Structure formats: C-alpha cells, structure tokens
Amino acid sequence: MTVNETKGSYPMSDVNVPTVKLNDGVEMPTLGFGVFQVPDLSQAEQAVTDALNTGYRLIDTATAYQNEKAVGKTIAKSSVKRDDIFVTSKLWVSDFNYDQAKKGIDASLQKLGLNYIDLYLLHQPYGKVDEAWRALEEAQKAGKIRSIGGFQHDAKALEEVDAELQRHPSR
C-alpha cells in the first residue's frame, strides 16, 4: 500500500489528528466529515459549520451529493483558514470522458468557490476512466487539484489505471 502513516498532524482545534502521506507527498487527515445524503443546502451548511466548529478539518463532498456549493459557502464564511481545511470531492461517472471531466472539475471548483481541491476522486470505476483520469492529471499539473485518486475502486481497477497513466492514484 502506498499510503504512509506519518507522525504529522493536521490542525484540528485542540485535537491532534494523525495524518497519512499520500503517494504524491500530500498530507491528509485521517479523520473527516462527509456530507453524503445531505442534499438540502441549508442542512449541509449547518452540518459543515458544526463539523468545522467541532474541529474537523477534512470535509468530503461529491458532485453526486449536490451540496458542493453549500460546502464552499461554509468554508468561505468559516474562521478556519482555507489552508487548514482538506477538501475532498468526486467526479461522477456521467462525466467520465475527457471533455466532460474537464468541465466537471471546473464546475466543482466553481460550486465550491475554491482555487484548488485537495483530493479529487473518480467516484466509481465505470465508463471512460482513462479519459477522465487524463483530465484529472492535467488539472493537477495546473494546480487545480493537489491529489488525485479513485473511490470505490478495487485494487485491480487502480492497478489498471496505474499501468497506463502518468500519475498514480492516491491511496
């Protein structure tokens, strides 16, 4: 496995949260808050506000969750510095071709109101994964995404991506 445990920690209020170092060197908190199944934007905003106030510093969302805008709005209003919040989002399978993936990445950034996303994942291993991955690589090179990876992908699917592409999935 290419995730390395580190002795580092992520700023989380008074709590010392361990981090893992992804294979590209990016440090990710091991504890996070996800907003899956919270499509009501006001509820999502309140949930993320409460999570940040409680000390969570990893926030997980996705295009399919339909709440990226609420997550971004909450981050913008928060007293927590952006650099102290690790944001994960995911590209949905309907955008798994090169052109749609590029548009999907930009749409996530726009909805979140962020200059970059810390970790951007391919949500599921269906469709033109190779084309979507190429778009993620380009976005990473452009500074729009810090780390890229796959979500709900088994080891075989990640190995296939690994063998064909320039940048390896974060694991």
What positions do the PLM features span?
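A cross-domain feature marking catalytic cores of carbohydrate-active enzymes
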Residues: 35, 61-63, 84, 89-91, ...
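Glycine/proline-rich, positively charged
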Residues: 39, 96-171
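N-terminal binding-site loop/beta-alpha segment at the start of enzyme catalytic domains
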Residues: 3-85, 141
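Intrinsic low-complexity, intrinsically disordered segments enriched in polar/basic residues
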Residues: 2-8, 166, 170-171
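Short active-site-adjacent helix-start/loop capping segments
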Residues: 68-69, 95-97
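Basic side chains
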Residues: 57, 82, 90, 111, ...
